[in-house]
């Protein structure tokens, strides 16, 4: 992740947030990965450690990397609390992974790629450290192909969190995978429900930015309201919306 501030300030909130802690996509990732006892797993943008900890019973070792020292500390203490011994966390960036070529059987990245300063470089790094026939499992929210809706959702997320760089479209992901010999496959798409109040609190969004967000949501087109499931109360205060999420698999060829 690039801008460390929101995660540094609110690391504990990310550990307890249901979107990260209890998402059904975790089980889907594990099922898709076809884990074996001898596998080594790398989780990029590990956050509070939920993904690495979820994989840990099925593999030999999980390593989680995150750009923020505070997140690494939270994830490490979380693993210690759970008594998990085959997981470790360290500071590092997706664009410069501190590992040799062909190091991992499985690489995961869950709700983090939209923070990467150079997502294309990050995908190149994934392909470098992934073993031949290894699996890259990516979960993130994505932008619609319609450029107006793309700009709407990326602007919304940047208003709330300056560390948001860009949620890519699926055609962009396909191109990045193809350029790095990763065989692309859509595994599953879903709407990711967002409760407005907890989303704002978790992001540590200043009051002036929140006013801009409320205006942005109130001025949404009918198509944007439908696409992102925007719900407002009678006073125009946001209640909830959704982001478009996907699990993508890339097998290194």
Swiss-Prot record:
GO terms for biological process: methylation. It is an enzyme of class 2 (transferase). The keyword RNA-binding does not apply. One of its GO terms (molecular function) is methyltransferase activity. Keywords: Methyltransferase, S-adenosyl-L-methionine, Transferase. It comes from the Bacteria. S-adenosyl-L-methionine binds at residues 45, 66-67, 94-95, 110. Pfam families: Methyltransf_11. Its EC number is 2.1.1.-. Belongs to the methyltransferase superfamily. This is Uncharacterized methyltransferase YcgJ. It comes from Bacillus subtilis (strain 168). The lineage of its organism: Bacteria, Bacillati, Bacillota, Bacilli, Bacillales.
């Amino acid at each position: 992740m690039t801008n460390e501030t929101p995660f540094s300030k609110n690391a504990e909130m990310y550990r307890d947030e249901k979107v990260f802690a209890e998402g059904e996509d975790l089980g889907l990732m594990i099922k898709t990965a076809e884990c074996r006892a001898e596998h080594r797993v790398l989780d990029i943008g590990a956050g509070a450690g939920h993904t690495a900890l979820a994989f840990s019973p099925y593999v030999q070792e999980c390593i989680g990397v995150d750009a923020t020292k505070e997140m690494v500390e939270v994830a490490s203490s979380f693993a210690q609390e759970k008594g998990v011994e085959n997981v470790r966390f360290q500071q590092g960036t997706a664009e410069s992974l501190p590992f040799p070529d062909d190091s991992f059987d499985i690489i995961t990245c869950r709700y983090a790629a939209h923070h990467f300063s150079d997502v294309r470089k990050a995908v190149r790094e994934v392909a470098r450290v992934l073993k031949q026939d290894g699996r890259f499992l990516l979960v993130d929210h994505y932008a619609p192909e319609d450029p107006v809706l793309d700009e709407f959702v990326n602007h919304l997320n940047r208003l709330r969190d300056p560390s948001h760089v860009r949620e890519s479209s699926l055609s962009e992901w396909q191109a990045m995978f193809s350029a790095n010999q990763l065989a692309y496959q859509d595994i599953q798409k879903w709407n990711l429900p967002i409760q407005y109040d907890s989303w704002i609190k978790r992001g540590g969004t200043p009051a002036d930015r929140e006013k801009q967000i409320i205006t942005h949501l109130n001025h949404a087109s009918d198509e944007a309201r439908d696409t992102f499931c925007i719900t407002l109360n009678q006073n125009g205060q946001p209640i909830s919306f959704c982001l478009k999420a996907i699990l993508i698999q890339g097998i290194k060829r």
